[in-house]
């Protein structure tokens, strides 16, 4: 199987390569694609050197599967071209997510929707992925009526330049500003551009993607905040169900669901934190407690590595699902 990675030198692209090797993903040929400034350079993958190619070369190399993490403009142009050539595409950009022609997939949640006809498959937003991995088993059991989500997101979600801004400010170095304000020792309630309704685009991604993947009947509202941590996204989530619940049953549902690790022992100071989620493919959940202010309501704290499960790992898991279920061709 000929595998192409488009955007192979970026934060997510490098992470995809790492996850592929860790999970022993089976390919016969690896084609690494990056921007013109990187073409001709080499990357070492599993002790083997690979020369970085231009995206145009894919027309000749004809990959069977292409993993895109090079931004919306590249995906908009090249994903349909490759799909017409018979190549399956898994795309990390936002350009196809709300397009009804394409499926938005989290394998633990809706992987079973995939068929051989799906040539372009969209990877959800990082904050949506970790949220819905946790909400899915609870919605099946208790039917979520409303979700209030507040996120606390690492600058790594904005790319390498944003991480550099954080590190430069921490060291007192003047450098390029990705954000309109300093991020070090600050919290920015502003992720992506503001919309006419007063929400940011990031906040609306959480709302719209939850409706597309899980259930359009769930009332969702979100506030997304950028915080000065070098990796990991956190979410404070308040849920209201149509059915009542017992906390022990909630713990049981979450503990027995794939991709979830429950860390919930406040007496021993055990709860999810981004510093401990780094490098993990799991979604961590804790601070699980009944909301005493509203009937049938629950509070949760969800943490995950946004570059792993929030991007690279979910992409690779979709690819694994295609292979395991003979959907690739």
Please place each PLM-identified region on the residue numbering.
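N-terminal Rossmann-like NAD(P) cofactor-binding subdomain of oxidoreductases
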Residues: 1-183, 219, 283-284, 288-294, ...
């Amino acid at each position: 199987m000929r595998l192409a990675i488009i955007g192979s030198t970026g934060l997510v692209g490098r992470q995809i390569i790492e996850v592929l090797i860790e999970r022993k993903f089976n390919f016969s040929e690896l084609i690494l694609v990056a921007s013109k400034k990187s073409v001709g350079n080499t990357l070492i993958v599993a002790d083997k050197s690979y020369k970085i190619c231009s995206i145009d070369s894919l027309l000749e190399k004809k990959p069977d599967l292409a993993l895109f993490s090079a931004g919306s403009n590249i995906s908009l142009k090249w994903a349909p071209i490759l799909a017409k050539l018979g190549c399956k595409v898994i795309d990390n950009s936002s350009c196809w997510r709300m397009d009804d022609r394409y499926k938005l997939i989290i394998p633990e949640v809706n992987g079973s929707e995939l068929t051989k006809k799906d040539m372009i498959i969209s990877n959800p937003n990082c904050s949506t992925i970790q949220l819905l991995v946790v909400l899915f088993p609870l919605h099946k059991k208790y039917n979520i009526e409303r979700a209030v989500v507040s996120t606390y997101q690492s600058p790594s979600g904005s790319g390498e330049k944003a991480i550099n801004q954080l590190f430069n400010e921490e060291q007192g170095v003047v450098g390029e500003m990705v954000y309109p304000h300093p991020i070090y020792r600050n919290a920015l309630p502003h992720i992506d551009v503001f919309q006419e309704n007063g929400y940011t685009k990031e906040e609306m991604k959480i709302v719209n993607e939850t409706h597309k993947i899980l259930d359009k009947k769930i009332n969702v509202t979100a506030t997304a905040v950028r915080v000065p941590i070098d990796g990991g996204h956190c979410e404070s989530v308040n849920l209201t169900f149509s059915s009542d619940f017992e906390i022990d049953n909630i713990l049981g549902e979450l503990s027995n669901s794939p991709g979830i690790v429950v860390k919930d022992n406040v007496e021993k100071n055990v709860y999810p934190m981004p510093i401990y989620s780094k490098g993990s493919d799991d979604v961590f959940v804790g601070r699980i407690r009944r909301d005493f202010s509203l009937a049938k309501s629950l509070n949760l704290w969800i943490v995950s590595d946004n570059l792993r499960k929030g991007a690279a790992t979910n992409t690779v898991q979709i690819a694994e699902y295609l292979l395991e279920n003979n959907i690739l061709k």
